[in-house]
């Protein structure tokens, strides 16, 4: 959170919510926050619907929010560092990339563990996770289109970034 606060401060933004006035950002935010599931530990043990919703939420958030959605932003921020601009941001982004990568990896690992423990989850969640993947790629494409409205950056091309999220 400190890194993102520093980023907002460096960019002259008073708070995170300033970003939500951009439709491409608001759509991503709305989708990702709509995937959360609020169940207790006891619910997971006794309620198959709770397990399915938590597994789905975990997979979507871990793989797509922390594994896809942030990386185009990281790439753009790194492009500034490569041009010796926004110098303090570069190190913050390195730490954030490491942190988000661990979150993504561990969340996906936890999802796989849940599927090992409850094998029916994979089939129950597969379709909704696939649809979520398609949607997040589209939302991220919209976000990249917004970033590059005025053309490619000096050392980062839109098509390269699109290729990154379509892998």
Stretches found by the model and what they are:
Residues 1-2, 55-80, 102-106:
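Alpha-helical bundle segments that constitute or directly flank the non-heme di-iron/ferroxidase center
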Residues 1-46:
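Long, hydrophobic, well-ordered secondary-structure blocks that form the structural core
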Residues 6-16, 45-57, 75-95, 109-127, ...:
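Inter-helical turn/loop segments and adjacent helix faces that build the functional surface
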Residues 89, 103-106, 140:
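Alpha-helical interaction elements in eukaryotic regulators
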Residues 95-100, 131-132:
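Transmembrane helix-bundle signature of multi-pass membrane transporters/permeases
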Residues 128-160:
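Primarily interfacial, aromatic-capped hydrophobic alpha-helices that serve as membrane anchors
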Residues 165-167:
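Conserved small/polar residues in nucleotide/adenosyl-binding loops
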């Amino acid at each position: 959170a400190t890194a993102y606060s520093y980023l907002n401060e460096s960019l002259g933004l008073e708070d995170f919510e300033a970003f939500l006035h951009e439709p491409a950002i608001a759509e991503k935010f709305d989708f990702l926050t709509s995937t959360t599931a609020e169940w207790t530990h006891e619910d997971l043990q006794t309620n198959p619907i709770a397990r399915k919703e938590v597994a789905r939420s975990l997979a979507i958030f871990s793989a797509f929010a922390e594994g896809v959605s942030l990386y185009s932003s990281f790439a753009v921020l790194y492009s500034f560092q490569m041009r010796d601009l926004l110098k303090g941001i570069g190190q913050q982004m390195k730490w954030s990339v490491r942190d988000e990568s661990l979150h993504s990896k561990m969340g996906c690992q936890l999802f796989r563990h849940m599927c090992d423990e409850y094998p029916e989850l994979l089939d129950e969640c597969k379709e909704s996770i696939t649809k979520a993947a398609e949607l997040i790629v589209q939302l991220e494409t919209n976000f990249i289109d917004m970033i590059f409205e005025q053309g490619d950056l000096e050392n980062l091309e839109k098509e390269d970034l699109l290729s990154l999220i379509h892998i």
